[in-house]
């Protein structure tokens, strides 16, 4: 494997001799950023048996002593890197103050957006005036047709969601997708759940909605609140649950315009679509069709006035952070403090950086990469990605449950994976995004409108395979099945995930598992529905499909049994894709690591073998503390399992982990060999 040397400490250079008689000593090799070889040994609780509770064995000392910052709802390796990314971007913004940017440049737009965000006095001075035009338009609605015009406008809340993506039937072109939308709380369970906690959330939401109506000067805030919540509860009743939304086949319903009118007749699409800039579009993909058809009927069964109150509330709530402090505080109190347990608001500059990421993120990313991303890191990651792909290819050859016909298709798909590392080869053009100094509210909305118009303009054009769905300064990675691409932004390519000076086992267990995770998504419960071109196509034989489903059912049961809070258990079906990515990624990374050794034994370092260091690194990148409300929110809304599950359950299904730590029958984490899930 080519990557073994690249993952080791880079070669050292000799200093020039100080004198002919006495040569200077050789420079020390660069050291790992964390510990002596890339692992935080002080975080471990060695009083815990690894076979009883591996996550706490690796992270227990840290978990016992860590104090959650008041402005955080969770904190771990991802969060620490996100803090660093924010600080790096903030430093860029501070540098811009010393050199006025060129007129019309991306830098000027960034500066004007950020300065407008930071000028709280100007925001307070404008009061609710920026909302007046929207509230007047909403108040003027009298008929269902008026409502349809409003909900067709992407600037207003709507039970009809729109997004544009490559077409699952032909991924070389774009298609308009129509999906369920319109709730003020995260998902349907917050409206329909039966527990004291859900009752408390609903009461807090009622308080929040009432506060917003008071702030916009509504004549009857309490009555208006009742109308909004009643309407949203009816909408929640017809929404699909998150696990249903993962069904690729059920959410792929291609229709032409006539078929759309028949499928969802309560909407006058000839009125709705032109308002969204889609008047000429003839073909669509409908996602949750029953939720959409039943939700649209509420336009007939609910009074026009109830919808007007709904729209008025949401135009204020959705833009609360661009309005005076009273709006911002109310939004924080409910969405951050009540729903996720955050004690205090984050510093305004940090939220300003977050705002810029959402509106002009690639423009900021170009500046970020130029200053903070070493070109050599991209080359090293490119090689590591190639190593993981080779490891996946080796694993595909030996999968006993997969027949040859399906294996050939899987190999073909793996061979066409398109990895992107660091940053895009071309940067987004923000010329059409107009930013005016001193107008935060308008600038934020203009940014959203710019992005929607940019997407609409792509309809009828070939799919742009060079486009990125994340900014370089984002600490994350993703797989897109419609283009068969895996993407690793620059910001995640730092310790503890990637450190060219760390022990190779650490890099393979950390960033290697992340790379493998994204590759694994190409073959998870959703990704396996797409072929090597990104088209939805069944390339599985019935026999292999049955064996896959048998294994995934066993895997789901392991996560169903993971209950981090009383009455709060992971939904193994909802989190299946991410769980499969975690297991497959760890398996691939381990295979790549062993291949990199070329048949030799890894050295023992600080008493740990290479295999042990590999698994320790994986569990340590998932080290995280999280508040109870945030954890409950994650289980309900996020297809990723909690960190403690991600850093322990995959290991329990790998024979190599048992061998590395001497885990045996009788240990609490032990799973009999016949019950271990063996997929990728």
Task: List each model region and its residues.
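N-terminal low-complexity, Pro/Thr/Ser-rich intrinsically disordered segments
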Residues: 23-40, 44
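Intrinsically disordered, low-complexity linker/terminal regions across diverse proteins
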Residues: 28-30, 263-266, 285-289, 346, ...
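Bacterial N-terminal signal peptides that target proteins for export
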Residues: 1-7
């Amino acid at each position: 494997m080519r990557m073994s040397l690249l993952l080791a400490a880079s070669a050292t250079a000799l200093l020039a001799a100080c004198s002919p008689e006495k040569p200077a000593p050789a420079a020390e090799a660069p050291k790992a950023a964390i510990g002596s070889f890339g692992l935080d040994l002080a975080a471990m609780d060695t009083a815990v048996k690894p076979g009883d509770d591996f996550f706490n064995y690796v992270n227990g000392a840290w978990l016992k002593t860590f104090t959650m910052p008041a402005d955080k709802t969770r904190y771990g390796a991802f969060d620490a890197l996100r803090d660093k990314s924010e600080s790096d971007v903030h430093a860029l913004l501070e540098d811009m103050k010393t050199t006025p940017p060129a007129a019309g440049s991306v830098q000027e737009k960034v500066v004007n957006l950020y300065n407008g965000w930071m000028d709280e006095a100007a925001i307070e001075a404008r009061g609710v005036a920026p909302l007046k035009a929207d509230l007047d338009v909403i108040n003027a609605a009298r008929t269902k047709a008026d409502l349809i015009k409003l909900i067709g406008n992407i600037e207003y809340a709507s039970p009809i969601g729109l997004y544009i993506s490559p077409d699952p039937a032909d991924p070389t072109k774009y298609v308009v997708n129509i999906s369920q939308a319109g709730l003020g709380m995260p998902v349907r369970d917050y409206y329909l759940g039966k527990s004291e906690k859900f009752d408390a959330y609903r009461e807090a939401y009622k308080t929040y909605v009432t506060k917003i109506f008071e702030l916009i000067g509504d004549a009857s805030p309490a009555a208006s609140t009742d109308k909004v919540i009643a309407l949203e509860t009816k909408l929640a009743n017809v929404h699909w649950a998150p696990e249903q939304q993962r069904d690729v086949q059920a959410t792929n319903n291609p229709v032409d315009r006539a078929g759309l009118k028949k499928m969802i007749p309560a909407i006058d699409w000839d009125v709705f679509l032109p308002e969204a800039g889609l008047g000429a579009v003839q073909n669509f993909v409908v996602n949750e069709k029953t939720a959409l058809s039943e939700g649209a009927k509420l336009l007939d069964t609910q009074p026009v006035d109830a919808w007007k109150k709904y729209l008025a509330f949401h135009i204020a709530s959705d833009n609360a952070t661009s309005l005076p402090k009273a709006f911002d505080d109310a939004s924080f109190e409910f969405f951050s403090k009540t729903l996720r347990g955050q004690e205090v608001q984050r510093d305004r500059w940090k939220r300003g950086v977050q705002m810029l990421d959402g509106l002009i993120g690639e423009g900021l990313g170009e500046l970020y990469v130029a200053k903070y991303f070493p070109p050599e890191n991209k080359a090293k990651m490119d090689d590591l990605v190639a190593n993981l792909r080779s490891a996946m290819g080796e694993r595909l050859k030996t999968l006993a449950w997969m027949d040859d016909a399906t294996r050939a298709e899987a190999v073909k798909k793996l061979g066409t994976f398109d990895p992107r590392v660091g940053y895009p080869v071309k940067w987004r053009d923000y010329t059409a995004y107009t930013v005016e100094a001193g107008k935060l509210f308008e600038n934020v909305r203009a940014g959203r409108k710019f992005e929607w118009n940019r997407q609409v303009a792509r309809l009828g054009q070939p799919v742009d395979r060079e486009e990125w769905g994340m900014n370089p300064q984002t600490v994350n990675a993703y797989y897109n099945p419609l283009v068969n691409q895996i993407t690793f932004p620059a910001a995640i390519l730092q310790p503890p995930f990637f450190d060219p000076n760390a022990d190779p086992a650490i890099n393979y267990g950390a960033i290697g598992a992340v790379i493998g995770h994204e590759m694994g998504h190409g073959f998870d419960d959703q990704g396996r529905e797409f072929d090597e071109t990104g088209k939805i196509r069944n390339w599985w034989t019935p026999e292999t499909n049955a064996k896959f489903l048998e294994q995934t059912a066993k895997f789901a049961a392991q996560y169903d049994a993971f209950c981090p809070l009383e009455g709060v258990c992971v939904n193994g079906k909802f989190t299946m894709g991410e769980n499969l990515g975690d297991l497959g990624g760890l398996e691939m990374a381990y295979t790549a690591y062993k291949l990199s050794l070329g048949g030799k034994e890894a050295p023992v370092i600080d008493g740990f073998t290479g295999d042990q260091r590999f698994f320790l690194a994986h569990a340590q990148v998932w080290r995280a503390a999280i508040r109870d409300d945030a954890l409950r929110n994650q289980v309900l809304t996020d297809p990723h399992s909690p960190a403690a599950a991600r850093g322990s359950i995959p290991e329990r299904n790998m024979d190599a982990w048992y061998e590395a730590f001497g885990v045996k029958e009788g240990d609490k984490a032990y799973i009999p060999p016949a019950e271990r899930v063996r997929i990728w």
